[in-house]
Amino acid sequence: MDMMGLAGTSKHITFLLLCQLGASGPGDGCCVEKTSFPEGASGSPLGPRNLSCYRVSKTDYECSWQYDGPEDNVSHVLWCCFVPPNHTHTGQERCRYFSSGPDRTVQFWEQDGIPVLSKVNFWVESRLGNRTMKSQKISQYLYNWTKTTPPLGHIKVSQSHRQLRMDWNVSEEAGAEVQFRRRMPTTNWTLGDCGPQVNSGSGVLGDIRGSMSESCLCPSENMAQEIQIRRRRRLSSGAPGGPWSDWSMPVCVPPEVLPQAKIKFLVEPLNQGGRRRLTMQGQSPQLAVPEGCRGRPGAQVKKHLVLVRMLSCRCQAQTSKTVPLGKKLNLSGATYDLNVLAKTRFGRSTIQKWHLPAQELTETRALNVSVGGNMTSMQWAAQAPGTTYCLEWQPWFQHRNHTHCTLIVPEEEDPAKMVTHSWSSKPTLEQEECYRITVFASKNPKNPMLWATVLSSYYFGGNASRAGTPRHVSVRNQTGDSVSVEWTASQLSTCPGVLTQYVVRCEAEDGAWESEWLVPPTKTQVTLDGLRSRVMYKVQVRADTARLPGAWSHPQRFSFEVQISRLSIIFASLGSFASVLLVGSLGYIGLNRAAWHLCPPLPTPCGSTAVEFPGSQGKQAWQWCNPEDFPEVLYPRDALVVEMPGDRGDGTESPQAAPECALDTRRPLETQRQRQVQALSEARRLGLAREDCPRGDLAHVTLPLLLGGVTQGASVLDDLWRTHKTAEPGPPTLGQEA
């Protein structure tokens, strides 16, 4: 067809019309002579990109690309141009195109006329309406550029030392490069390199079912991961031999450390059958997984289990059993460990541990134990025929590693409905210590969850009477007729249920009195009352068991003395002090009164009511010595002399000087009073009397009296002062006689 005859027609449209007239290959392609087509990309951010063409098998080839832009009504065309082998001398290129519509992959083979041993130029055109977008052109030798396949089968994942190891089978020869990418629920994709797969290190493992195996290592995390693998052919020179393969299907792995569960275990007490019900409540934790692992196995926990391990009676055939989480259990009173397990692709992981301690029967059941020499025998009530028993004993307060147990299968039924077990080899129960003895029974001894507790008891081995004797008995006075007795706890008290009581015996050494007190095993003190003073007593203590009484302790002697309480001593001391204080106060007051009467105080002229002058004195003199009474004029000081008329008794004068006055006290009292009144009148006339002298105060007036050995009554002087009147101030008259 002459293309020049289609003048004015678009070359692309003309080319498409020609291809419609030609034959089409399997890839819906058309081969034409090269015309002038655009050589560069469209330059737009939209359109096809990352074109890659490669060989996928011996005869099959493929080209793929990516596209950015609207997906509706878009069509893609793959162009491939080459020089035919028989036109190498002319250099004339021929082109072929493959229309893929909206798909971004084109497959073809050698029969489509594409040379695979020579260079071929490829590009993609994407048409959207009247717009055409073109990719970058690539040149490729198809036969040597091979794209490998990703791991298509099962990828085995294992975990060790905080690393994940992935292994898979490949059908072609080894020699590929391997990469991985991973992401977690909170992170984006992270690219990692597995390195070349060679016959060393973590490379080829060997032939598995006629194929080769490859492996890759990547870090393990505490979160769920999504991992994908891709491969690329690697030449012997180390250069890449093809593009990267597609990513494999997601490989989902759980976290290395699973979150802890919060399961609550509820345990009921032992029932009459020797079993207790265990109920589990709560939900197992849910894991967060990446987007590609939602709904896919691998990252999630497959199931949750509970591992029940019976720590008691380890001589049984099987000591543990696994049950689903949430199942109600009926367990014996033995000690158990319960582990909550999470089953993942890596196996079982413990996410919670719980310890169930042993529980004893509420009622006491008889256990007969006898030890003689190297022979130890035990006897207890039998259960139903065909029952297997597990006898366990261990020293109390010791590690469980010292536990001894034995399985007992009675051959024939005892008429007395008793089970007897004896052994003559060690260990025996002859040491002086506490033993815990438990008997379990089961119809199915191979299942550790079907045992029941039929007997639990404690036994103190050796000579319990001697070992249980209380030590360090002491006696202390308490009240007037009682004492307190104390002692250290018996060694039997460390063995639950063995010590039944203490017995305290007190007796007088003269044999006149004796009594005993029963004390509970939890107490180590008792008060003894009803005792007498000044009597020698002795007290002893013993510890009794249910089987036999204990041995008496060493006697403790004491003499009961009446003691005075401290409060009485305090009151007596206070009374003595008060008595001394009272006697001292009374004595002081009595001495003061006696001194007052024996040595009265001197009379005060201003305060007395009378002054008696001796009758033998004929004169009476007063002297005022205070100059403040006469501030204007100062006169020579002289004494006032008053001469009393009358006869003198003895005719003698007082040995005082002339200004002094002597009064005759031998005259009658009335005569003396008259004379005193006259003397007072004379003193008033002279202005020598003062009313400003306070009563009882002689600080401003000096009145020397010539008494001659006889003192007048205080009433006379008092009358003188009472009749005194204040005179007008004036110059005093000295030396005037009455």
From Swiss-Prot:
Disulfide bonds join 53-63. Residues 47-152, 152-258, 259-359, 360-465, 469-565 form the Fibronectin type-III domain. Pfam families: fn3. Glycans are attached at residues 50, 73, 86, 130, 144, 169, 188, 330, 368, 374, 401, 463, 477. Coiled coil: none annotated. Residues 592-738 are cytoplasmic. Residues 1-19 form the signal peptide. Its main location: membrane. Residues 20-565 are extracellular. A motif (WSXWS motif) lies at residues 244-248. Gene3D superfamilies: Immunoglobulins. It is found in: Membrane. It is a single-pass type I membrane protein. The chain crosses the membrane at residues 566-591. Dimer or oligomer; disulfide-linked. Interacts with IL12RB2 to form the high affinity IL12 receptor. Heterodimer with IL23R; in presence of IL23. The heterodimer forms the IL23 receptor. Belongs to the type I cytokine receptor family. Type 2 subfamily. Functions as an interleukin receptor which binds interleukin-12 with low affinity and is involved in IL12 transduction. Associated with IL12RB2 it forms a functional, high affinity receptor for IL12. Also associates with IL23R to form the interleukin-23 receptor which functions in IL23 signal transduction probably through activation of the Jak-Stat signaling cascade. This is Interleukin-12 receptor subunit beta-1. The gene is Il12rb1.
